[in-house]
Curated annotation (Swiss-Prot):
Subunit structure comment from the entry: Part of the 30S ribosomal subunit. Forms a tight complex with proteins S10 and S14.
Pfam families: KH_2, Ribosomal_S3_C
Name the record gives this protein: Small ribosomal subunit protein uS3
Biological process according to GO: translation
Domain KH type-2: 38-106
Feature: compositional bias, Low complexity: 261-350
Protein purpose: Binds the lower part of the 30S subunit head. Binds mRNA in the 70S ribosome, positioning it for translation.
GO terms assigned for molecular function: mRNA binding; rRNA binding; structural constituent of ribosome
Record-linked HAMAP family: Ribosomal_uS3_B
Family: Belongs to the universal ribosomal protein uS3 family.
Keywords: Ribonucleoprotein, Ribosomal protein, RNA-binding, rRNA-binding
GO annotation, cellular component aspect: cytosolic small ribosomal subunit
Length: 350
């Protein structure tokens, strides 16, 4: 399929772009006809200008035409007279305001359309077709092309029967979609009839190899990591710190700080608890001594002057009075036991 189809249409969106950029729903037919007429007008009176291609772009009520040429001086004319004439003809044809841009082709030796046009001009001036084809191939290979194929079809050399001949040099991979292949076609008008000239020029692969692509992706990832991060943003309400990046970072650092100081705090608390627990055990006998002298502390409670106050009618006062006899009774019960304990040796002696 790649041997038959036009390389530009076969690679649209991959290595080649559309030469007409516009969108129309109901006027599609009219716009296509206008584009064909514009390109015919450019090629009819500009044979010596070396026009490579014409790009057409439409906007609402406006038309932009980009002319790519190897000889911009011929298209512009003296003091821009030729450019003004072309602009006027385009405005008459389309009825819209036209913006005309004339662009120069930097390397015409590798442009397929210009190479085909050069071969056709030589055939029109009765140059041998083999000589013209080989000269074009040598010039293109010196200009940086990786491969070229030139084909001529018609009554070659004035023969009665038409035939096709082609010459090729280098690589021309027509089936490879990633290959950047330029294609050009031009017709030479001779005394014996028309001779068609087709040129394919291979300029290299546009899509990179897998290793190069992986290296480029790795470099892009590295640049993304090194890219400076933007500052913290405020939360949804603008006042909450927990929803911001700074608040999260602060909370995270606090948690880490607590986790690091927790063992020290636990050891300090355990040591303090150990000292407190040992202190009462050592002073246990001393603590029992004041319990024996409890009547001295209860004496003022029984004679509390608060009972004579008007507030003595409240419920807490009788409770205090009732507790005082209970403590006294317990103390009185304890004292006989204490008195009886020293008497036990006397019974033993008897």
């Amino acid at each position: 399929m790649g041997q038959k189809v036009n390389p530009h249409g076969f690679r649209l969106g991959i290595t080649s772009e559309f030469t007409s950029r516009w969108y129309a729903d109901k006027q599609y037919k009219a716009y296509v006809g206008e584009d064909v007429k514009i390109r015919k007008m450019m090629s009819r009176g500009m044979e010596r200008a070396g026009i490579s291609r014409v790009d057409i772009e439409r906007t609402q009520g406006r038309l932009r035409v980009d002319i790519h040429t190897a000889r911009p001086g011929i298209v512009i004319g003296r003091r821009g007279a030729e450019a003004d004439r072309i602009r006027g003809d385009l405005e008459k044809l389309t009825g819209k305001q036209v913006q005309l841009n004339i662009l120069e082709v930097k390397n015409p030796e590798v442009d397929a359309q210009l190479v085909a046009q050069g071969v056709a001009e030589q055939l029109s001036s009765r140059v041998s077709f083999r000589r013209a084809m080989r000269k074009a191939m040598q010039t293109a290979m010196k200009g940086g092309a990786k491969g070229i194929r030139v084909q001529c079809s018609g009554r070659l050399g004035g023969a009665e029967m038409s035939r096709s001949e082609f010459y090729r040099e280098g690589r021309v991979p027509l089936h490879t979609l990633r290959a950047d292949i330029d294609y050009g076609f031009y017709e030479a008008r001779t005394n014996f009839g028309r001779i068609g000239v087709k040129v394919w020029i291979y300029k290299g692969d546009i899509v990179q190899s897998r290793a190069e692509r992986e290296a480029q992706e790795a470099l892009q990832r590295q640049t993304r990591r090194d890219r400076p991060r933007r500052g913290p943003r405020s939360g949804s309400s603008g006042t909450t710190q927990g929803g911001t990046d700074a608040g999260r970072a602060a909370a995270r650092s606090e948690r880490r700080g607590r986790g690091g100081n927790a063992p020290a705090a636990e050891t300090a608390a355990s040591e303090a608890g150990a000292t407190e627990s040992t202190a009462p055990e050592s002073t246990a006998p001393e603590s029992t001594a004041p319990e024996s002298t409890a009547p001295e502390s209860t004496a003022p409670e029984s004679t509390a002057p608060e009972t004579t106050a008007p507030e003595a009618a409240s419920s807490p006062a009788p409770a205090a009075e009732s507790t005082a006899p209970a403590t006294a009774a317990s103390e009185s019960a304890a004292t006989p036991a204490a008195a009886a304990t020293p008497g036990t040796p006397e019974k033993a002696e008897e």
